[in-house]
A protein has these predicted regions:
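Sec-dependent N-terminal signal peptides
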Residues: 3-14
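Short, conserved sequence motifs used for protein processing/export or organelle targeting and
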Residues: 190-192, 197, 201-369
């Protein structure tokens, strides 16, 4: 009986954990961290809810947790500062994500990320452990100044120090069929790479207006939605001319696939201009399609990967074109992506959403012979 009581108390503590957490609004950070707040405000971290992200909204509109259970089961990572996060994570509870709740629409708030004390690694998905000390934030600047608003801790936090504080949400996510729906498969030791070094590079501007500094870590979180130009240095495009054809090489020098979400579709577009006339060659498509019973399916239904031609971590992909290059030809190459595979647009009713239908140019190269 005593062991049973202790077990129940332990469960109560675990599930009540989020109720012990309340987070300062991100707007509070703006007064001192003006540049960082402006970057954050336009990022996906500030706009991850169904009401603010049309693509996520379209997927959520089809989700059984929305239509049958009225519970925002994505809250653990999309609205982690929600005042009813416990209910969002608890089977049988009703906990929708609503527009008029500021703790929902603040998304992945400044205070939430900077209170991640440690990360528990799990097979299904990882879990962020949040410090119970409000207004004590983890950072990396050793010569930080005392803030009148909050305390700052710069030691004793492994994940903040090694730049992989993101893996609580961005490492992997398995569904009920044991399918890894979305995964970075990150190798933390790879050439010293980490999440922050690529997605939060150093940019000009001070961390705060209380002490002038030359640079800070970018808080717009470069990715497939925004600021992808910051990532072009990590992918190289080269061309090899042969006698009767040519090869384009795409060298992905990152520690994860070129695109991670199964909705995405990368495309290599190639045009050859000769004597003022441009010939468009066939697009090369890179995708990862998940599905069930042989057909593409939503992430909660999918049980297998049906197709995977996505460029993988540290892969140099070669694409051959049966086109003979002549002297004076110019070859224009564009590598980019659709945030939603065009084949899924109609099913998700996203025909009128520019963010879903437009082609995002990532990197361009031109070669003249």
């Amino acid at each position: 009986m005593r062991l049973l009581t202790l077990f129940i108390l332990l469960l109560s503590t675990l599930y009540a954990n989020d109720k012990a957490h309340s987070f300062a609004p991100s707007e509070d950070c703006k007064a001192c961290h003006t540049e960082i707040y402006d970057e954050y405000y336009t990022s996906m971290h500030a706009n991850p809810t169904p009401q603010k992200d049309p693509i996520h909204g379209a997927v959520w509109n089809k989700h059984p947790m929305n239509n049958k259970h009225d519970r925002y089961s994505c809250g653990k990572c999309h609205t982690p500062a929600a005042d009813n996060l416990d209910d969002m994570k608890t089977k049988g509870k009703k906990a929708p994500v609503v527009m008029d709740n500021p703790t929902h629409q603040t998304g992945i708030s400044c205070a939430y990320c900077h209170r991640i004390e440690s990360i528990e690694l799990h097979e299904i998905h990882n879990t962020n452990i949040i410090s119970k000390t409000e207004k004590k934030y983890f950072g990396t600047l050793k010569d930080n100044i005392d803030s009148p608003y909050h305390a700052t801790a710069t030691s004793g936090n492994e994940h903040m120090a090694n730049g992989n504080v993101c893996i609580g949400c961005h490492s992997h996510k398995k569904n009920k069929h044991d399918l890894n729906v979305c995964s970075t498969n990150i190798d933390n030791e790879l050439d010293g790479a980490n999440c922050v070094s690529c997605h939060m590079p150093k940019v000009k501007g001070s961390v705060s207006n209380m002490k002038e500094r030359k640079e800070h870590s970018f808080h717009g979180f470069a990715g497939s939605h925004f600021h992808s130009d910051m990532l072009t240095q990590h992918v190289d495009i080269s061309m090899l001319r042969q006698i009767d054809d040519f090869i384009i090489n795409i060298d992905n020098r990152t520690s994860h696939s070129l695109l991670l979400h199964p909705l995405r579709m990368a495309v290599l577009k190639v045009n050859v201009t000769r004597d003022g006339k441009t010939t468009k060659l066939k697009d090369e498509v890179f995708v990862r399609v998940i599905g069930h019973n042989g057909k593409p399916a939503m992430p909660w239904v999918a049980s297998v990967t049906l197709k995977n031609t996505m460029i993988q971590a540290n892969e140099k992909r070669s694409v051959k074109y049966d086109f003979k290059i002549q002297k004076g030809d110019r070859v224009d190459i564009v590598l980019g992506w659709y945030l939603v595979n065009p084949k899924a647009i109609k099913a998700l009713k996203l025909e009128n959403e520019k963010v879903a239908t437009e082609f995002n140019e990532f990197k361009k190269e031109s070669f003249t012979f």
